[in-house]
From Swiss-Prot:
Subunit and partners: The Tat system comprises two distinct complexes: a TatABC complex, containing multiple copies of TatA, TatB and TatC subunits, and a separate TatA complex, containing only TatA subunits. Substrates initially bind to the TatABC complex, which probably triggers association of the separate TatA complex to form the active translocon.
Residue stretches of biased makeup (Pro residues): 100-119
Name of the molecule in the record: Sec-independent protein translocase protein TatB
Gene it is expressed from: tatB
Organism: Hyphomonas neptunium (strain ATCC 15444)
One GO process term, biological-process aspect: protein transport by the Tat complex
Lipid bilayer topology: Single-pass membrane protein
Taxonomic lineage: Bacteria, Pseudomonadati, Pseudomonadota, Alphaproteobacteria, Hyphomonadales
Keyword Aminoacyl-tRNA synthetase part of the UniProt annotation: no
Length: 140
């Protein structure tokens, strides 16, 4: 129904139309009025649908732009991946041409060579009690 018009107002309008138009032409007038209202509603629906299409198209344009931006960022990502692959290829080629040998393993220091018995200090002197010094004399 129309906003702000209740049943009593419609009844009053109907009575006024009956008096002004007359009972003979009132049904034809009501039918024409109904057809006009139907056409008006169809036009309003088409108008609303056109606005909805424009809004939907605007949203689609935004989505297309976002997709295009994502594709461009994916292009940059794929370019970075390609660059990393080329770098790996170059590094492997350089390593084949000039291999880097690992540093030689650290060797533990060699144990001291055994000295000949004449040059070596007496091994027994470390464990043996001190001998008497002939220069000092034996004062035991």
């Amino acid at each position: 129904m129309l906003p702000g018009i209740g049943f009593s107002e419609l009844l009053l309008i109907g009575l006024a139309a009956l008096i002004i138009i007359g009972p003979k032409d009132l049904p034809m007038m009501m039918r024409t009025l109904g057809q006009l209202m139907g056409k008006g509603r169809r036009m309003a629906r088409e108008f609303q649908a056109a606005f909805d299409d424009i809004a939907r198209q605007s949203e689609l344009d935004e989505l297309k732009k976002e997709i295009q931006d994502l594709r461009q960022s994916n292009t940059f990502k794929s370019a970075q991946d390609d660059l990393a692959a080329y770098e790996a290829d170059v590094n492997s080629a350089v390593m084949r041409e000039h291999p880097v040998s690992p540093p030689p393993p650290a060797t533990p220091p060699a144990p001291p060579a055994e000295l000949p018995p004449e040059a070596a200090p007496h091994a027994d002197s470390q464990n043996a009690p001190p001998e008497a010094d002939p220069a000092k004399g034996d004062r035991t």
